[in-house]
Amino acid sequence: MSFFKTAVRRFSSTSITRGMAKAIAYSEYGNPKEVLRAVSYNVPKCSKNQVNVRFLASPINPSDINQIQGVYPSKPPFTNDVCSSKPSAVAGNEGLVEVVDVGDQFKGTFSPGQWAILGSVNLGSWRTEMNIDGRSLVPVDKSAFPSIAEAATLSVNPCTAYCLLQHVVQLNKGDWFIQDGANSMVGIATIQLAKHFGYKSINVVRNRPDIEKLKEQLKSLGATIVITDEELMDRKTMKQKVPEWIQGGEVKLGIDCVSGRVAAEMAKYMSKGATMATFGGMSRQPLPVPVSLLIFKNLKFHGFWVTKWKSEHPEEFLKIIHKVEDFYRNGTLKTVNTELVSLKEDADEKTFLDTFLNAIEGHGKKIIKFEH
């Protein structure tokens, strides 16, 4: 019997009581298949400074997986809130909730039926219900979103894209940037926001059998130029093409979520004094920066972590959330290439766990949508 099946049996009750909350939890770091388990627990009436919420949708982000593996810098507390037998953390950081009950302290801020998103990290979003400090919730207007997918993914990917375009370097209308991972959720949001702001872009994606279809999709969203990583590596052609594309303009910004050779190659086509912001490392390779780019082009390289940025600029980040909400409302932003995975909140624990594990292993962006 596999570890996770054993874990389900060990921490589950023998009969599931309708009305109990469920969560995906772990008490040690490691492979999600081996350490995750489903737990059922009671949620008491919320206290005066709490809001009782039920989860409508919980995205699965790469950082969530890294957190479970124990390799992510931000780590949740292990408590006995959902499992009395062993201190545990609830997985997930991003989530869309509906208010069910409101403690006295927040009755003027929240009301039953209202939508909100988690405003803090490490709260545990892969669950059906919780009591949460009202200060950790950000109310959102449900009418602003075409679907539940946009609202559920509001706080991470589009806000990261906004920060990368608006808070790394000063870009003016007509300026260029180059980005890898352009078909990632952040990349797609960056393309759409850049179109809105009037920025032009060179977008790098991995080659694939249906590459022309992908190129057309990204261009329809606002991408100026789309190339493959193989085309990027063709220096002779790139040295000819880039000047033709930018027509005397400047590539002031590089946006990198891949690192390795791809990011290093992108840097060669950035203008003097430009900045590359790295917010991911999907290649799991270091970034080999030629000394000449530092000395003769004065390029700047730094990391960007939206969690840290949010903690250092909480008021500004709240404004960004509402700006992004407006972008969804007016059609500037739309969510593409996402899959909603339905899960009944009263499903048995094995089904509950298996649904999350299958979503983790699958390809593309997955959002668990709880059916009430």
From Swiss-Prot:
SMART domains membership:
PKS_ER (SM00829)
Q: Where is the transit peptide?
A: 1-18
Q: Which Gene3D superfamilies match?
A: Medium-chain alcohol dehydrogenases, catalytic domain, NAD(P)-binding Rossmann-like Domain
Q: Which reaction does it catalyse?
A: a 2,3-saturated acyl-[ACP] + NADP(+) = a (2E)-enoyl-[ACP] + NADPH + H(+)
- Keyword annotations for this protein? Fatty acid biosynthesis, Fatty acid metabolism, Lipid biosynthesis, Lipid metabolism, Mitochondrion, NADP, Oxidoreductase, Transit peptide
Q: Which GO terms describe its cellular component?
A: cytoplasm; mitochondrial matrix; mitochondrion
Record CDD domains: ETR (cd08290)
Q: Does the keyword Metal-binding apply?
A: no
Q: According to its UniProt record, which protein family does this protein belong to? A: Belongs to the zinc-containing alcohol dehydrogenase family. Quinone oxidoreductase subfamily.
The protein in question is named Enoyl-[acyl-carrier-protein] reductase, mitochondrial
* Organism listed in the record: Schizosaccharomyces pombe (strain 972 / ATCC 24843) (Fission yeast)
